[in-house]
């Protein structure tokens, strides 16, 4: 297992909520806003500011089938990107996911 794979897998395993994002991405900002508004403790990684960000993004594609950001995990479960996350929010399903966090 590469160091990037170990980093991503550890981040997902060690945190209830993990978001792999990019600092300039409006969809990432929308996800981060909901998390902040709900006062959820989340680990957010701005991969465009990390030296190995491209490698992380490539591994996320391999792991999840999704290359785009944000790439969101709740309780080690991949929930998708911002559109998936916002759909869960609109349906009122985020609270139950977060409450198990």
From Swiss-Prot:
Gene Ontology biological-process entries: cellular response to oxidative stress
Domain of life: Eukaryota
Entry GO terms, CC: cytoplasm; cytosol; nucleus
InterPro entries per the UniProt record, alphabetical: GLR_AS, Glutaredoxin, Glutaredoxin_euk/vir, Glutaredoxin_subgr, Thioredoxin-like_sf
Membrane spanning stretches: none
Any single Pfam family the record assigns to this protein: Glutaredoxin
Disulfide links within the chain: 25-28
UniProt KW Electron transport keyword: yes
Domain named Glutaredoxin: residues: 5-101
Gene3D superfamilies: Glutaredoxin
Single annotated GO MF: glutathione peroxidase activity
Record has Electron transport as a keyword: yes
Keywords, comma-separated and alphabetical: Disulfide bond, Electron transport, Redox-active center, Transport
Family according to the record: Belongs to the glutaredoxin family.
Protein purpose: The disulfide bond functions as an electron carrier in the glutathione-dependent synthesis of deoxyribonucleotides by the enzyme ribonucleotide reductase. In addition, it is also involved in reducing some disulfides in a coupled system with glutathione reductase. Thioltransferase catalyzes cellular thiol-disulfide transhydrogenation reactions. It transfers reducing equivalents to cytosolic protein and nonprotein disulfides.
Protein's name according to its UniProt entry: Glutaredoxin-1
């Amino acid at each position: 297992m590469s160091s990037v794979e170990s980093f991503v897998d550890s981040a997902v395993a060690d945190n209830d909520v993990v978001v792999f994002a990019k600092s300039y991405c409006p969809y990432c900002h929308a996800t981060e806003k909901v998390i902040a508004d709900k006062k959820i403790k989340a680990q957010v990684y701005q991969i465009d500011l990390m030296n190995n960000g491209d490698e992380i993004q490539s591994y996320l594609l391999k792991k999840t089938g999704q290359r785009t950001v944000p790439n969101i995990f709740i309780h080690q479960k991949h929930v998708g990107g911002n559109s998936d996350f916002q759909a869960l929010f609109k349906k009122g399903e985020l609270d139950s996911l977060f409450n198990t966090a």
